[in-house]
Design a protein with these regions (language model features):
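Cleft-lining beta-strand/loop regions that shape enzyme active-site pockets
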Residues: 1-12, 18-24, 28-220, 226
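Generic structural signal for buried aliphatic residues
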Residues: 17-18, 47, 235, 283
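Acidic/polar loop patches that form or flank catalytic/metal-binding clefts of enzymes
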Residues: 145-146, 196-200, 230, 234-237, ...
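Extended catalytic-interface subdomain
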Residues: 210, 222-240
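Active-site rim segments in enzyme catalytic domains, especially the processed small/beta chain
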Residues: 218, 224-225, 229, 245, ...
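Conserved functional hotspot residues or short segments at active or partner-binding sites
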Residues: 234-235, 239-417
Length: 417
C-alpha cells in the first residue's frame, strides 16, 4: 500500500510474507482469518515479518510499526490535455474532500482551466463528502440536494459560496454504476447548468434510511425519505412493492431494452420532464441522472471472451506472475511513467500465457473474429495493470482511459468547448 507502514520500512510490491513474528504462515495449513489476526494489532505496536523477494536467496526480515493504513478514494489526478484536468473519484469517504482539494491544487498549479470529473463506477458513500465537493462548483445558496419524506421534514443542503472552482468548465462522466452520493454531485451540477454530464443513465440510488436495532442483535434499515436534485427530481429509481427480483434485475432490463447501447430506445413520459434552473434545459426524472451527452456501451470492444478471462481471474493472475518474474528489468527499463507510457508494449509471451491458461479452463472465443476484437482492449488492460504495479493507480487510469469512449468524449467536448 502506497505510503503505508510496510512501504516505509522497505517492503515492496511483489514481496511474499512467509512468517509473522517467527511463526510460519506459508506452506502450512492456516486459515486466512488466523493470518490476519497475527498481522493486525494496536496502532503503535510492532510486528516482525519474514519476506521472500524474487532474486534474493535468503528470507529478509522487517519490523513494521502498525499504523493506520491510508485508503484513498480519489483514484487518479492528472492533466489529460493542456489546460484540462482530470480527477477520478472511486467512492465518497471520510478523506475524499481532502484528497479532492489536494488534487485540484495540483492541477491548478499545472495550468488547469477546465475539469473532467470522472464518477464512473462510483457507488457513493458519505453524503457530507458529496456536498462538500459539489460546493466547490456552485455559488452561494445554490441548492445541492434535499431530502423529503412522508413524515420527515424537508432538509436542504446549500452551497456556501466559498468554492474554489466557480468559473471553469466542468464535465462529469457517469455510467450505469454511478450511484448515491455520486448522483447527488452529478444532479447538482446538471440542474444548475454548471457543467455537462456525459455517459449513460446512472444507477438510481437515493434512499435515506434509519438503522433500527432488533432485540436479537440483528438490524433493519427503514427508508424514511428520498434524495432529490435541485430541480425536484427523485434520484431513487422506482420499485414495485414486494417485487425484489424486478428491482434487482434493473441492469439486465436496461441492457435487454437497448438503453445502454442506443439513446433512441429511451423514452420518458411528459410527467418526468423537469427543467434546469439557469438555462431551463429539459432534463428527466424517473430515477438516476440522464446524461446531457449519451455515450453507448461498446459491446464490440467488451467481448464475452474478455469478460470470461476477467471473471476467472486469468488476466490479473497472469499479470501478477509477469510482474513478479520481470520486476527488476521493468524498473530498470522504465524508470519513469513517461518512459513506460511511450515505450512499453505488451509482449506476445504475456498474451500467449493468457491463451494457454484460458485453454486449460476451457474458455475460448467463439471464433477468430471475436479474438481479434478482444485483443486491443486486453492489451490496453494489461499495460494499465503493469503501470499500476510499477507506479500507482493514477497511472493505471492514464493508460486505460485511452480506450474509454466516455473519457474520450469528455476530452473531445472539453477541447472543443
Amino acid at each position: 500500500m502506497s505510503k503505508g507502514p510496510s512501504e516505509k520500512v522497505g517492503i515492496m510490491a511483489g514481496d511474499r510474507i512467509v512468517n509473522v513474528n517467527d511463526t510460519a504462515i506459508a506452506g502450512v495449513k492456516m486459515k486466512k482469518e488466523e493470518i490476519m489476526k497475527r498481522l493486525r494489532g494496536p496502532r503503535g505496536t510492532t510486528v516482525k515479518l519474514g519476506i521472500v523477494r524474487r532474486g534474493v536467496p535468503d528470507v529478509m526480515y522487517f519490523t513494521v510499526k502498525r499504523d493506520k493504513i491510508p485508503v484513498k478514494s480519489v483514484d487518479a489526478v492528472y492533466m489529460i490535455r493542456p489546460q484540462i484536468g482530470y480527477i477520478r473519484i472511486g467512492n465518497f469517504g471520510a478523506t475524499t474532500y481532502k484528497e479532492f482539494m489536494e488534487g485540484m491544487e495540483k492541477l491548478k498549479a499545472e495550468g488547469m482551466k477546465d475539469l473532467i470529473l470522472d464518477l464512473q463506477d462510483n457507488g457513493g458513500g458519505y453524503l457530507q463528502a458529496a456536498v462538500e465537493i459539489a460546493n466547490e462548483f456552485l455559488p452561494k445558496d445554490d441548492l445541492i440536494v434535499y431530502t423529503d419524506g412522508r413524515r420527515i421534514r424537508r432538509m436542504d443542503y446549500k452551497a456556501r459560496g466559498n468554492g474554489s472552482f466557480l468559473t471553469g468548465r466542468v464535465y462529469v462522466l457517469v455510467n450505469e454504476f454511478t450511484a448515491s452520493a455520486a448522483e447527488i454531485v452529478t444532479g447538482a451540477i446538471q440542474d444548475h447548468d454548471r457543467g455537462i454530464v456525459i455517459g449513460r443513465r446512472t444507477f438510481g440510488k437515493g434512499l435515506v434510511q434509519r438503522p433500527i436495532d432488533l432485540p436479537d442483535g440483528s438490524m433493519i434499515r427503514l427508508t424514511i425519505a428520498h434524495y432529490y436534485t435541485p430541480s425536484g427530481r427523485c434520484i431513487q429509481k422506482p420499485y414495485t412493492k414486494g417485487d425484489i427480483e424486478d428491482y434487482a434485475m434493473d441492469f439486465e432490463k436496461r441492457l435487454k431494452h437497448g438503453e445502454l447501447t442506443n439513446r433512441d430506445s429511451i423514452h420518458f413520459a411528459d410527467s418526468l420532464k423537469f427543467y434546469t434552473l439557469k438555462e431551463h434545459r429539459t432534463v428527466y426524472g424517473g430515477g438516476g441522472i440522464m446524461p446531457d451527452t449519451f455515450v453507448p456501451l461498446d459491446t464490440l470492444q467488451y467481448t464475452k471472451f474478455h469478460r470470461q478471462l476477467v471473471l476467472k481471474g486469468i488476466v490479473i493472475n497472469t499479470d501478477l506472475r509477469y510482474i513478479d518474474k520481470n520486476r527488476k528489468q521493468l524498473v530498470g527499463d522504465y524508470p519513469t511513467f513517461e518512459a513506460f507510457r511511450s515505450r512499453f508494449e505488451v509482449p506476445q509471451e504475456l498474451i500467449d500465457e493468457i491463451m494457454k491458461e484460458a485453454e486449460k479452463q476451457k474458455i475460448k472465443p467463439k471464433d477468430d473474429e471475436e479474438l481479434q476484437r478482444t485483443l486491443p482492449y486486453l492489451k490496453s488492460q494489461l499495460k494499465a495493470l503493469v503501470a499500476r504495479d510499477l507506479f500507482d493507480m493514477s497511472e493505471y487510469f492514464q493508460i486505460i482511459n485511452e480506450t474509454s469512449d466516455i473519457v474520450k468524449k469528455g476530452v473531445e467536448l472539453s477541447a472543443g468547448k
